[in-house]
Design a protein with these regions (language model features):
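Conserved catalytic cores of soluble enzyme domains
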Residues: 1-107
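Intrinsically disordered, low-complexity segments enriched in small/flexible residues
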Residues: 95-137
Length: 137
């Protein structure tokens, strides 16, 4: 994915309720641009995996509003982890993908901004459960 960006932008589209987790979330993070819809979810681990490891009191995978407030498309866009927030509409997604191809490569690719993301992680207070507003800071 990173090597392809020498030639043209690589655009990830994350749509629908299944989510983009694990290796696919890493692949999305390497793309030139990440486009998400309202139903999209993006994270290294899925809600069930986090619940299994942390416990249901910490992370209830059945609490859909809670899950989407942390990993949903709107949240990922608002927190800067996605470049566009789109309607779940095929024509809008198609138009946006073409627009991002036409835009060309970003001045500083996401894969070259690791220090920025590490700084953001370092600023988190791990003693407290994150909420939607805290994730956007």
């Amino acid at each position: 994915i990173v090597d392809l960006q020498r030639y043209q932008p690589v655009v990830a589209v994350i749509a629908g309720p299944v989510g983009c987790f694990g290796g696919m979330s890493i692949a999305a993070g390497l793309c030139s641009y990440v486009l998400v819809t309202r139903e999209a979810r993006l994270g290294l681990n899925g809600p069930q995996v986090i619940e299994q490891e942390a416990g249901i009191a910490e992370y209830d995978s059945r609490d859909r509003p809670f899950i989407w407030s942390l990993t949903g498309g709107e949240q990922r866009f608002a927190s800067g982890l996605a470049d566009a927030y789109l309607a779940d509409d095929l024509d809008e997604v198609r138009t946006s993908v073409l627009a991002y191809f036409a835009k060309g490569l970003p001045a500083r690719p996401r894969c070259r901004r690791a220090e920025d993301y590490l700084r953001r992680l370092g600023d988190l207070d791990t003693a407290e459960q994150p909420d939607a507003a805290g994730v956007r800071r």
